[in-house]
Curated annotation (Swiss-Prot):
This is Large ribosomal subunit protein uL1. NCBIfam families: rplA_bact (TIGR01169). Pfam families: Ribosomal_L1 (PF00687). Part of the 50S ribosomal subunit. Keywords: Repressor, Ribonucleoprotein, Ribosomal protein, RNA-binding, rRNA-binding, Translation regulation, tRNA-binding. CDD domains: Ribosomal_L1. InterPro entries: Ribosom_uL1_bac-type (IPR005878), Ribosomal_uL1 (IPR002143), Ribosomal_uL1-like (IPR023674), Ribosomal_uL1/biogenesis (IPR028364), Ribosomal_uL1_3-a/b-sand (IPR016095), Ribosomal_uL1_CS (IPR023673).
């Protein structure tokens, strides 16, 4: 049997397996256990009572976290004319059409979010094999294909997260950084849960939000007592 590392021993000594922690307890303990040389993210996993094999039970959308994610977000926008000026004014890092598509085909993909106006989809449609595998393909269901590109840019820069149930019916997303106040993290998670509940499929039966787990990038996952969340 492999020996536990010093970090693993510290986690084993302080984490009670199977316990449901209040949100504040979990955030505090995870921050205490963070002992790496970079600032870890706080991540949340939400197990939903859906059957992801059924297309009408796939939950996807986007949430603007009230306190952001703590990350600097690079945004590229496919649009032209007045939309291009509005996108740049809103803080877009790069705006273009065929020129931007050519750069991306050549390997310049240093962006976290790609947004497009509807009239630009004729250009973006050529980039499916480039953007799709990276999760960057604009999609109207998460607000990244929109005539109001300026608002989409502002939302992305403000800390909007996009989500979709995986094959097990679980939503995974980042909700902040170690160093965030617990209250700010909690507001972010509550905003996410509120949107998930709003998007509940009509065909979903039984308990919808089955489990909420909070973790850090390199840390353990702690089950959250949902009674400690206002959502």
């Amino acid at each position: 049997m492999a020996k536990l590392t010093k970090r693993q021993k510290a986690i084993a000594a302080k984490v009670e397996a199977g316990k449901a922690y209040t949100f504040e307890e979990a955030a505090s303990l995870l921050a205490e256990l963070s002992a790496v040389k970079f600032t870890e993210s706080f991540d949340v996993a939400v197990n939903l009572g859906v059957d992801p094999r059924k297309s009408d039970q796939v939950v996807r959308g986007a949430t603007v976290l009230p306190n952001g994610t703590g990350k600097t977000v690079r945004v590229a926008v496919f649009t032209q004319g007045p939309g291009a000026e509005a996108a740049l004014a809103a803080g877009a890092d790069k705006v273009g059409m065929d020129d931007l598509a050519a750069e991306m085909k050549a390997g310049d993909l240093n962006y976290d979010v790609v947004i497009a106006s509807p009239d630009a989809m004729r250009v973006v449609g050529q980039l499916g094999q480039v953007l799709g595998p990276r999760g960057l393909m604009p999609n109207p269901k998460v607000g990244t294909v929109t005539p109001d590109v300026a608002t989409a840019v502002k939302n992305a820069k403000a800390g909007q997260v996009r989500f979709r149930t995986d094959k097990n019916g679980i939503i995974h997303t980042s909700v902040g950084k170690v160093g965030f106040e617990a209250a700010a993290l909690k507001q972010n998670v509550e905003a996410l849960l509120a949107d998930l509940k709003r998007l509940k499929p009509s065909t979903s039966k039984g308990i919808y939000v089955k489990r909420v787990t909070l973790s850090t990038t390199m840390g353990p996952g702690l089950i959250i007592d949902q009674a400690s969340l206002d959502a």
